[in-house]
Amino acid sequence: MGQFTVVSLGLLAVFLSLSGAKGDNCPANWISRNGVCNKLFPDRKTWLEAEMYCRALKPGCHLASLHRDSDSTVLAWYISDHFKGAGHVWIGLRDTNRKRTWKWSDRTSTNYFSWNQGEPNNVQDNENCVHPWAPSGYLKWNDEPCASLHPFICQYKL
């Protein structure tokens, strides 16, 4: 009877891990945040190249979208703690029509902004993509030309 119990518990553990039991099931090297998985990629890409890279990883994966202060804080900590010297990092916010109408690449609601003072400033009418600003500890955002090369954060929902 004891051996049966051990085997049964072992099979239950395997089943739960494979079936996505309640909890955070982000892959190794990804972090969990409010029901999504995030990973910073150190490769420097344009905003569009980064978005296409994220989309190719997994259905529903995009550059990260942030919807509250806690989202910004978690990602700022992650970038600062694990990727010192990464510089600016692309997130999924962009002004696709160049009319100062900001939208997330995953099409979630644009209900939260964390602009650095004086931003967005659209220098030379060419800053249509967004990154957390390194000098702010990645807590405040800056608009920048989409052709700039930066590391980036991909995100998908659990």
Swiss-Prot record:
GO terms for molecular function: carbohydrate binding; metal ion binding; toxin activity. Ca(2+) binds at residues 127, 142-143. GO terms for cellular component: extracellular region. Mannose-binding lectin which recognizes specific carbohydrate structures and agglutinates a variety of animal cells by binding to cell-surface glycoproteins and glycolipids. May be a calcium-dependent lectin. A motif (Mannose-binding) lies at residues 119-121. This is C-type lectin lectoxin-Enh7. The lineage of its organism: Eukaryota, Metazoa, Chordata, Craniata, Vertebrata. Disulfide bonds join 26-37, 54-154, 129-146. Its main location: secreted. Residues 33-155 form the C-type lectin domain. Keywords: Calcium, Disulfide bond, Hemagglutinin, Lectin, Metal-binding, Secreted, Signal, Toxin. InterPro entries: C-type_lectin-like (IPR001304), C-type_lectin-like/link_sf (IPR016186), C-type_lectin/snaclec_domain (IPR050111), C-type_lectin_CS (IPR018378), CTDL_fold (IPR016187). Expressed by the venom gland. Residues 1-23 form the signal peptide. Belongs to the true venom lectin family. It is found in: Secreted. Pfam families: Lectin_C.
